[in-house]
Every structure is written in structure tokens, then in C-alpha cells.
């Protein structure tokens, strides 16, 4: 978890637009993400934030034409450092956002969240931009691999080239 950088005002006090950006929280966990999302909203929102975008990457029952029975995510031992750096890179590039991102590892049932990202900003365009950037970069740059159990009994690894 990172804290608010010194000298930045995220409160929007006195009607001012928030300046700077901050990563409120990042993690890799075996815990279910759904209960964490409500607390995350309270962490990222301030009175200056007029938009909150939430992305939940949900485990689905199919992938590239194959029926999926279940899956499990594995992560590199340094995945927590990677996700923190990736989310910080978005905060460094986009002014006035507050970010929260957690990826789940271990077995995850169909219909449950594997990745949750929250991005708050004064305006919706910036919040959408930040949320999409975090989700895309986490998938592309954080060393997490998915083992899918297909309904035909075979298994398939996804993201192993990360």
C-alpha cells in the first residue's frame, strides 16, 4: 500500500479540483474480492471526486471457444511489487485520480471476481481512462498465470509467457 505523496491536495477543499494522483491500495490476495470492494469505495472517494469507475474481472464459464469448469491463479513471489509499480505508473501519468487495485490468486469459482480496480476522479472521462489503464497494465505486466480446468477434463495455462 502506498500513501498520499506530500504536497498534493486530494480533498478538493474550497471547491478546487483535486491535484496530483494517489494509489490508495494494491494487493495480491487469496481473499474474495467482493467484500473488499465496499471498503475500497470509501478509501478512494472524497467530496472532490465526481466519478467512480469500478472494473470487476469476473471468472466466466468459457474462454476462446472452450467450456471452463473452474480456474486457479498463481503469482510470482514479487507480484505484489509489480502490481504496486504498475498502478503507480498510471497515477504518475494521469492527474487527479485515486486508485485501488487487487488481484486474487488461488482457486476462483465461476462468477467470482479475479481482479477489481477502482478509479476515482473529479470527472468521468479521467476515471474511465485511469480504470482501463490499470486493468490493462495489470493483465499485461503483472506476473500472474491462470490455470483453467476445461469441461473436457484438460487443463490450459494462460499468461504463462508474462
Task: Name each model-derived stretch.
Residues 1-114, 120-132, 136-162:
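N-terminal, polar/charged subdomain of small-to-medium soluble alpha/beta proteins
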Amino acid at each position: 500500500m502506498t500513501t498520499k505523496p506530500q504536497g498534493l491536495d486530494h480533498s478538493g477543499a474550497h471547491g478546487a479540483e483535486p491535484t496530483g494522483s494517489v494509489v490508495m491500495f494494491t494487493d495480491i490476495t487469496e481473499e474474495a474480492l467482493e467484500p473488499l470492494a465496499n471498503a475500497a469505495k470509501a478509501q478512494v472517494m472524497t467530496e472532490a471526486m465526481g466519478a467512480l469507475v469500478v472494473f470487476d474481472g469476473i471468472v466466466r464459464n468459457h474462454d476462446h471457444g472452450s467450456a471452463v469448469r473452474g480456474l486457479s491463479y498463481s503469482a510470482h513471489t514479487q507480484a505484489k511489487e509489480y502490481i504496486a509499480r504498475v498502478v503507480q505508473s498510471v497515477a504518475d501519468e494521469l492527474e487527479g485520480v485515486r486508485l485501488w487495485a487487487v488481484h486474487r490468486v488461488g482457486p476462483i469459482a465461476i462468477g467470482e471476481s479475479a481482479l477489481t480496480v477502482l478509479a476515482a476522479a473529479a470527472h468521468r472521462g479521467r476515471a474511465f481512462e485511469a480504470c482501463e489503464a490499470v486493468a490493462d497494465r495489470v493483465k499485461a505486466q503483472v506476473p500472474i498465470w491462470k490455470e483453467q480446468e476445461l469441461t473436457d477434463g484438460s487443463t490450459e495455462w494462460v499468461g504463462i509467457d508474462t
